[in-house]
């Protein structure tokens, strides 16, 4: 799949993905169709069918592979906005849906702009891992069950708002970190140093060694605070903490190999930014 994106003319991926993301987000116009006489489900089905037909008409592989993913995420974002403004107990879930779709789309867009050489369909992170998928499904199931049997729990607006602020903070920090790192940022931990790889210690990297992980850490926990999911909130916190503990150690082994004393000095001066995580231990 990574090879598909490579055959798209360089520089066009960002424009293509943005155009089709906005196309999918035009589902926001669906209420106008229902006012015109179409029933909600009928209008939605016709809209989805129309989107698919348009994408098939306009694009061929590999551009279609990018377009369908970006359009899907735009569609999910639009549905999230509609749900957010609905008069139901699911409006906070709409916030979550918007946050989730924006996270995945922005990962691709920023990579396309910032480091196109590393860009692939995997940059959407839609197939991140089985564990990631299970975690997401678990949070949806918990929200649904608690919304049915304990609906008042899902209407603690101040708590959901606090979770939304955590999500916004985490998302912004991660994207700033990606832009600051530039071509040095990669979704995959590198085992070999490229000729252009440099150690970034400025900007947000002067505050913490792993700002992109810090952002993702608080974003992940914030989604569950937003949903008022007590069970997944605790499980997410423990799971992502352990994941980033192992991930920082794995990455720092490579960074020490790449940059030697330069990274060791940086490591002494600047914390990881993640709570109770110090990174790989270096023997004296």
Curated annotation (Swiss-Prot):
<dbReference type="GO" id="GO:0048146">
    <property type="term" value="P:positive regulation of fibroblast proliferation"/>
</dbReference>
<keyword id="KW-0472">Membrane</keyword>
<feature type="topological domain" description="Cytoplasmic">
    <location>
        <begin position="1"/>
        <end position="16"/>
    </location>
</feature>
<keyword id="KW-0489">Methyltransferase</keyword>
<dbReference type="GO" id="GO:0031929">
    <property type="term" value="P:TOR signaling"/>
</dbReference>
<feature type="binding site">
    <location>
        <begin position="197"/>
        <end position="200"/>
    </location>
    <ligand>
        <name>S-adenosyl-L-methionine</name>
    </ligand>
</feature>
<dbReference type="GO" id="GO:0030282">
    <property type="term" value="P:bone mineralization"/>
</dbReference>
<dbReference type="GO" id="GO:0048144">
    <property type="term" value="P:fibroblast proliferation"/>
</dbReference>
<dbReference type="GO" id="GO:0008340">
    <property type="term" value="P:determination of adult lifespan"/>
</dbReference>
<feature type="transmembrane region" description="Helical">
    <location>
        <begin position="230"/>
        <end position="244"/>
    </location>
</feature>
<dbReference type="GO" id="GO:0046499">
    <property type="term" value="P:S-adenosylmethioninamine metabolic process"/>
</dbReference>
<keyword id="KW-0256">Endoplasmic reticulum</keyword>
<dbReference type="GO" id="GO:0008104">
    <property type="term" value="P:protein localization"/>
</dbReference>
<dbReference type="GO" id="GO:0035264">
    <property type="term" value="P:multicellular organism growth"/>
</dbReference>
<dbReference type="InterPro" id="IPR007269">
    <property type="entry name" value="ICMT_MeTrfase"/>
</dbReference>
<feature type="topological domain" description="Lumenal">
    <location>
        <begin position="150"/>
        <end position="154"/>
    </location>
</feature>
<dbReference type="GO" id="GO:2000772">
    <property type="term" value="P:regulation of cellular senescence"/>
</dbReference>
<keyword id="KW-0949">S-adenosyl-L-methionine</keyword>
<feature type="binding site">
    <location>
        <position position="190"/>
    </location>
    <ligand>
        <name>S-adenosyl-L-methionine</name>
    </ligand>
</feature>
<dbReference type="GO" id="GO:0080120">
    <property type="term" value="P:CAAX-box protein maturation"/>
</dbReference>
<feature type="topological domain" description="Cytoplasmic">
    <location>
        <begin position="113"/>
        <end position="131"/>
    </location>
</feature>
<feature type="topological domain" description="Lumenal">
    <location>
        <begin position="88"/>
        <end position="92"/>
    </location>
</feature>
<feature type="topological domain" description="Lumenal">
    <location>
        <position position="229"/>
    </location>
</feature>
<keyword id="KW-0812">Transmembrane</keyword>
<dbReference type="GO" id="GO:0001889">
    <property type="term" value="P:liver development"/>
</dbReference>
<dbReference type="GO" id="GO:0046578">
    <property type="term" value="P:regulation of Ras protein signal transduction"/>
</dbReference>
<comment type="similarity">
    <text>Belongs to the class VI-like SAM-binding methyltransferase superfamily. Isoprenylcysteine carboxyl methyltransferase family.</text>
</comment>
<feature type="topological domain" description="Cytoplasmic">
    <location>
        <begin position="175"/>
        <end position="212"/>
    </location>
</feature>
<feature type="transmembrane region" description="Helical">
    <location>
        <begin position="93"/>
        <end position="112"/>
    </location>
</feature>
<keyword id="KW-0808">Transferase</keyword>
<feature type="topological domain" description="Cytoplasmic">
    <location>
        <begin position="60"/>
        <end position="69"/>
    </location>
</feature>
<dbReference type="GO" id="GO:0015934">
    <property type="term" value="C:large ribosomal subunit"/>
</dbReference>
<keyword id="KW-1133">Transmembrane helix</keyword>
<feature type="binding site">
    <location>
        <position position="247"/>
    </location>
    <ligand>
        <name>substrate</name>
    </ligand>
</feature>
<dbReference type="Pfam" id="PF04140">
    <property type="entry name" value="ICMT"/>
</dbReference>
<dbReference type="GO" id="GO:0004671">
    <property type="term" value="F:protein C-terminal S-isoprenylcysteine carboxyl O-methyltransferase activity"/>
</dbReference>
<dbReference type="GO" id="GO:0032259">
    <property type="term" value="P:methylation"/>
</dbReference>
<dbReference type="GO" id="GO:0098556">
    <property type="term" value="C:cytoplasmic side of rough endoplasmic reticulum membrane"/>
</dbReference>
<feature type="binding site">
    <location>
        <position position="251"/>
    </location>
    <ligand>
        <name>S-adenosyl-L-methionine</name>
    </ligand>
</feature>
<dbReference type="InterPro" id="IPR025770">
    <property type="entry name" value="PPMT_MeTrfase"/>
</dbReference>
<dbReference type="GO" id="GO:0050905">
    <property type="term" value="P:neuromuscular process"/>
</dbReference>
<dbReference type="GO" id="GO:0032880">
    <property type="term" value="P:regulation of protein localization"/>
</dbReference>
